[in-house]
Amino acid sequence: LRGCVARTLAAYGLLLCHGLQHCSELNAMNLADDILEPFRPLVDLYVVQNISEDELLSPSAKRGLFALLGCDILSDNQHHSVPYAIERLVQSLMVAINFARVPPLTLPVLVPLARHQYE
């Protein structure tokens, strides 16, 4: 997820090192970490449902975590894939930056884990 967020931010011309809340000089992806925060419950839900407390991060668990990019999530009351929800959030951030006004950001809403159905 962090890589998808970072690529989307870079595609919109934003500097990843300048965060909103994260501000470590040693972290080159402060902004990506800020934008990633609303998507953290998606990972938490997967871990709670699929990985036992004493289990190591197995290859199958890693595949499952990677597959979260293909999951469904609500964005602006519509079902979207996670990468598109990330893009919508970045677009709303760009509006706030470019027009010096603070409209509500398009934050994701967690839904039960399911693969996104493309039309």
Short names for language-model regions:
Residues 2-119:
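N-terminal intrinsically disordered, cationic/polar leader segments
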